[in-house]
């Protein structure tokens, strides 16, 4: 029974979020590390690859890594079936498709009403232990209180593994909520919260009414 299940919700930003947008030229006086933005709207986004990568990393550590493991293709089978494998001769498609999360319309309206900026500039400073020379820099962060719309597609490939897969998705989300997303997490950045609005079958006839991840 091949089906697709869609998970829709919000990602709430609890502390300033920094996911860098590479490839931008920094001018004199410009922010040293800007956040990644949607080229169309110019609003901050959370790349699906960032969400997926952090979920995979945390879940793999939680389930247990192979001693001496150096490659993600050596993850446990339950990780590989959710997130995929690119190993030559054993390529495995990911059951999860995590889209970019876009700045929500509700957040735009709330921020505009309160005259709040969508992003903020955080000043950081490192000092060389050898020379005592300071190296100040400016980091752009998505402002606390922002909310992003997200959706995930889960491909049902084996009905006997759906419940276990959703338990692992639930665990990965819980781990991420108690860790951080993006850069500077040890300095307070990147605390987020998932709010699940709906889980429904959009292709096929798999009964998703009993599924939950929160």
UniProtKB/Swiss-Prot annotation:
InterPro entries: CRISPR-assoc_RAMP_Csm3, CRISPR_Csm3_endoribonuclease, RAMP_III_fam. Keywords: Antiviral defense, Endonuclease, Hydrolase, Nuclease, RNA-binding. Disulfide bonds: none annotated. Its EC number is 3.1.-.-. One of its GO terms (biological process) is defense response to virus. It comes from the Bacteria. GO terms for molecular function: endonuclease activity; RNA binding. Belongs to the CRISPR-associated Csm3 family. NCBIfam families: cas7_TM1809. Encoded in a type III-A CRISPR locus. CRISPR (clustered regularly interspaced short palindromic repeat) is an adaptive immune system that provides protection against mobile genetic elements (viruses, transposable elements and conjugative plasmids). CRISPR clusters contain spacers, sequences complementary to antecedent mobile elements, and target invading nucleic acids. CRISPR clusters are transcribed and processed into CRISPR RNA (crRNA). Part of the Csm effector complex that includes Cas10, Csm2, Csm3, Csm4 and Csm5. This is CRISPR system Cms endoribonuclease Csm3. It comes from Enterococcus italicus (strain DSM 15952 / CCUG 50447 / LMG 22039 / TP 1.5). The gene is csm3.
């Amino acid at each position: 029974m091949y089906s697709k299940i869609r998970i829709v919700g919000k990602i709430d930003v609890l502390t300033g979020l920094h996911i860098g947008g590479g490839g931008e030229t920094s001018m004199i006086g410009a922010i040293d590390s800007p956040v990644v933005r949607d080229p169309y709207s110019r609003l901050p986004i959370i790349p699906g690859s960032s969400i997926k990568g952090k979920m995979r990393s945390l879940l793999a550590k939680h389930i247990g890594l192979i001693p001496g493991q150096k490659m993600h293709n050596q993850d446990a089978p339950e990780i590989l079936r959710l997130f995929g494998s690119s190993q030559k001769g054993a390529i495995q498609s990911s059951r999860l498709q995590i889209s970019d999360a876009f700045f929500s319309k509700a957040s735009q309206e709330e921020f505009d009403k309160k005259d709040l900026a969508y992003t903020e500039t955080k000043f950081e400073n490192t000092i060389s232990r050898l020379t005592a020379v300071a190296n100040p820099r400016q980091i752009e962060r998505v402002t606390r209180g922002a909310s992003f719309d997200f959706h995930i597609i889960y491909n049902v490939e084996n009905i006997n593994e759906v419940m276990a897969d959703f338990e692992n998705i639930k665990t990965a989300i819980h781990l991420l909520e108690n860790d951080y997303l993006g850069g500077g997490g040890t300095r307070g950045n990147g605390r987020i919260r998932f709010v699940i609005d709906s889980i429904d079958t959009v292709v096929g006839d798999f009964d998703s009414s009993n599924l939950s991840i929160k």
